Swiss-Prot record:
Encoding gene per record: TAT
InterPro entries for this protein: Aminotransferase_I/II_large (IPR004839), PyrdxlP-dep_Trfase (IPR015424), PyrdxlP-dep_Trfase_major (IPR015421), PyrdxlP-dep_Trfase_small (IPR015422), TyrNic_aminoTrfase (IPR005958)
Protein's UniProt name: Tyrosine aminotransferase
Cofactors: pyridoxal 5'-phosphate
Functional pathway: Amino-acid degradation; L-phenylalanine degradation; acetoacetate and fumarate from L-phenylalanine: step 2/6
Species per Swiss-Prot/TrEMBL record: Arabidopsis thaliana (Mouse-ear cress)
A Pfam family this chain is assigned to: Aminotran_1_2
Length: 420
């Protein structure tokens, strides 16, 4: 019996789940949404999460929509798929990724997942052996942190250096690693920093990972979202140096995150992952996981094959324009420093100068009051591992973006120590 004679039940909250959820972007966004003033009739400016698909300017290509409809009408994809995906989808992804490489990827190395997030879940679960640790960047995409916490895989953080264009602190990586380190994560183009790694820097990362005897996880969900001086280069180019697992999806480039179609590709030309047994472990975890909708998989050849380059180039030009406006407007706000002009993905990281602000205690307080006073959502940096910074999403309608920076400027002026 429980207190006061009440019946005691043998289930309840799971502390591991609670801790893991507290690391997610969604948890922070929900907190900020609850801060919004319901009496404010202005539209909410959503610069906190990376999903521009609701905006008319970022609708997907009609060819992709028709591919889905054709796959459904065909009735060929009403059945379950194999655990690693429908063969035509695996082949389509292999050919799509190979078009950027100096070699061909085998469809057998492609595993189709329910978005990139499921690929993360599968991979972290496979890596989480007792005593192991993984190297994650700081700042980071926190789904890796959350899943690692859930799987009780130790995380060690290496720094991305804003003064060096957010390049990896490779000396720090070597200092963190030991004989229990299993992998290093590289997100390129980078969420949350908005940088694109050069070919030379990627090679140095691969060489460092080889020296340490660890595999490279290459999160390339923003592949081809590069609009600065550096072209996108896949870490797959360095698979001869070190085992690489590439994660990706159609979510970002096609602006369809709700379709939940991603992939995980094992690049292991020397058989290192296979001989160690890790590939089989990965397949075993895949076998315990659910599959993406089969008709989405069946549509993949036509989604990839029928989407014209004009669609990609026009959308990328739009994102680039948004990035330029974002950077220009940030430079006008004294209490905010943007160390690097964004050149990839749809985000940038900026630092708050609290010496110029009053009544603001930290980045979460800043974002909470911004939501309440200006109906504007920006993600606090602590959500991505960098306290007292902000992650700003700029891929929205231009009118919303301009209005958002007007509100942000008004907010910072109102909370400035030097206000009249």
């Amino acid at each position: 019996m429980g207190e006061n004679g009440a019946k005691r039940w043998n289930f309840g909250a799971n502390e591991v789940v609670e801790r893991s959820n507290s690391l997610t972007i969604r948890d922070y966004l929900n907190t900020l949404i609850n801060c919004l003033d319901g009496g404010d009739v202005r539209p909410v400016i959503p610069l906190g999460h990376g999903d521009p698909s609701p905006f008319p300017s970022f609708r997907t290509d009609q060819a992709a929509v028709e591919a889905i409809c054709d796959a459904v009408r065909s009735t060929k994809f009403n059945n379950y798929s194999s655990s690693s995906g429908v063969p035509v989808a695996r082949k389509a992804v292999a050919e799509y990724l190979s078009s950027d490489l100096s070699y061909q990827i085998s469809p057998n190395d492609v595993h189709i997942t329910a978005g990139c997030v499921q690929a993360i879940e599968i991979l972290i679960s496979a890596l989480a052996i007792p005593g192991a640790n993984i190297l994650l960047p700081r700042p980071t995409y926190p789904m890796y942190d959350s899943r690692a916490a859930f799987c009780q895989l130790e995380v060690r953080y290496f720094d991305l250096l804003p003064e060096n264009g957010w390049d990896v602190d490779l000396d720090g990586v070597e200092a963190l690693a030991d004989d229990k380190t299993v992998a290093i994560l590289v997100i390129n183009p980078c969420n949350p920093c908005g940088n694109v790694f050069s070919r030379q820097h990627l090679q140095k990362i691969a060489e460092t990972a080889c020296k340490l005897g660890i595999l490279v996880i290459a999160d390339e969900v923003y592949d081809h979202f590069a609009f600065g001086d550096k072209p996108f280069v896949s870490m797959a180019e360095f698979a001869e140096l070190v085992p690489v697992i590439v994660l990706g999806a159609i979510s970002k480039r096609w602006f369809v995150p709700g379709w939940r179609l991603g992939w995980m590709v094992t690049l292991d030309p020397h058989g290192i992952m296979k001989d160690s047994g890790f590939v089989q472990t990965l397949i075993n975890v895949v076998n315990m996981s659910t599959d993406p909708a089969t008709f989405i998989q069946g549509a993949m050849p036509d989604i990839i094959g029928n989407t014209k380059e004009e669609f990609f180039s026009s959308k990328l030009e739009m994102v680039k324009k948004c990035a330029e406006i974002c950077y220009e407007e940030l430079m006008k706000i004294p209490c905010i420093t943007c160390p690097c002009k964004p050149e990839g993905s749809m985000f940038t990281m900026v630092k708050l100068n609290f010496s110029l602000l009053e009544d603001i205690s930290d980045d979460l307080d800043f974002c909470s009051k911004l939501a309440k006073e200006e109906s504007m959502i920006i993600l606090p940096g602590q959500a991505v591992g960098l306290k007292n910074w902000l992650r700003i999403t700029f891929a929205v309608e231009l009118e919303l973006l301009i209005e958002g920076f007007s509100r942000l400027k008004n907010f910072t002026e109102r909370h400035s120590k030097n206000q009249p």
